Amino acid sequence: MSEEESQKTIGIVGAGLVGCLAALAFAKKGYDVTLFEYRPDPRTVDSSKRNLRSINLAVSSRGIRALQYVDPAMADRILEHVIPMKGRMIHDITGTKQESQVYGLNGESINSIDRSFLNNCLLDELDKSNVKILFKHKLVKLDTSNACRMTFIDGHNDAKTSTFDFVVGCDGAHSQFRYHLQKTMRMDYSQKYIDMQYLELYIPPSEDANNKFSIDANHLHIWPRHNFMLIALANKDGSFTSTFFSPWSVIEGISSSQEFVEFFRHNFPDAVGLIGEDALSSAFKSNPRGSLMQVSCYPYSNGKGIILGDAAHSMVPFYGQGMNCGFEDVRILMELIDTNNGDIEEAFKQYSAARKNDLDAICKLALDNYYEMSSKVVDIGYLIKKKLDYTLGKIFKNKWLPLYTMISFRDDIPYAKAIEIEKRQNRIMNNVGLGVLGTAAVYGLVKLGQYWNRRQ
């Protein structure tokens, strides 16, 4: 990078996961970076006042690759704190049976990590860099007509304007940056609330001195009940972050905490013992219900400003790709800057076309996967097909890849390409299935004919 390029200034709005990684990535390339965040520093907030709308994260190949791209040593430090999950553990409605469904063809795992912990790790990494972080700064105005000027209201209620060469919005699904950027360009935009709520619950560590985990830590636990479900992901301290998902009508149809406990006794009997009746009652009365929303827009940049992560493509959490996809946004943008020899404006312009199909694909896939997690994981036909898919993957190695493998463990395969491959493989499986059924039918008719002839 030339001295002129390295002096370029970058303003980033949003110090969540994607904003922090973007700040680290730009700083690694030698740019002068300032990061703004509406909230106070989360590391200074009492942990008892943590956000109870936070679903645990599953870090997989795409997220890891992005972390390694920015700083391999940082990636290693973060990955020391994850818990590998080799598959799903399905809990039946009796509370007496559990079934493991492995994820990877070759023992691959996705990795559980607490969202707040990861965010704090990235903020700690930023403290070691030359990035300037300004908390309690609310964006109220953005102008990219010449230089990029952003106006903020700070913690003292004073207005401050800062000027940058380029600006980046990573401030989430309800992005103020996106709202202001839309005024500067022709951006298609839509948002859709999904008829689904989530309520965070907590499974405490076991009191067993020999094992702090009350259930298997190396699985993502699912209690599938068709139109609602419960999940649980392990934390390093032996606890599990558990989340109850349901249509709003289900949770709103429960009128009291005692009724909520009874609902759990009936639908998740083994989970009641893990969470505790008092904790369930308290959670129903006190914990907030989170909404699920999908956001889509296009293009993502006007050449001076760009949106990444949930600000550009908020998705439902059912494929575990929200954070992984946002981190991948950062890596792909950085690679475009490299390809264009440091020309950030050209990289911003190319980013939208390079990313759109993949972002549309994963948003749809995430929504579709709710049905798989809540219902299909106990369907015999689905399980037979998954077993065949897995077996073909083991036999034909890289010639046949299950969709989950491509999405979670093959960061070299774009999301849209993975779906194309899966559609082709489904056609092959369907044709093979029809062929097998046809052969069986012909065989049956022949045998019936032989039997009939013997009777004559």
Swiss-Prot record:
Its cofactor is FAD. Pathway: Cofactor biosynthesis; NAD(+) biosynthesis; quinolinate from L-kynurenine: step 1/3. GO terms for cellular component: mitochondrial outer membrane; peroxisome; plasma membrane. InterPro entries: FAD-bd, FAD/NAD-bd_sf, Kynurenine_monooxygenase. Its main location: mitochondrion. Its EC number is 1.14.13.9. Coiled coil: none annotated. One of its GO terms (biological process) is anthranilate metabolic process. One of its GO terms (molecular function) is NAD(P)H oxidase H2O2-forming activity. Keywords: FAD, Flavoprotein, Membrane, Mitochondrion, Mitochondrion outer membrane, Monooxygenase, NADP, Oxidoreductase, Pyridine nucleotide biosynthesis. It catalyses: L-kynurenine + NADPH + O2 + H(+) = 3-hydroxy-L-kynurenine + NADP(+) + H2O. HAMAP family: Kynurenine_monooxygenase. Catalyzes the hydroxylation of L-kynurenine (L-Kyn) to form 3-hydroxy-L-kynurenine (L-3OHKyn). Required for synthesis of quinolinic acid. Belongs to the aromatic-ring hydroxylase family. KMO subfamily. This is Kynurenine 3-monooxygenase. The gene is BNA4.
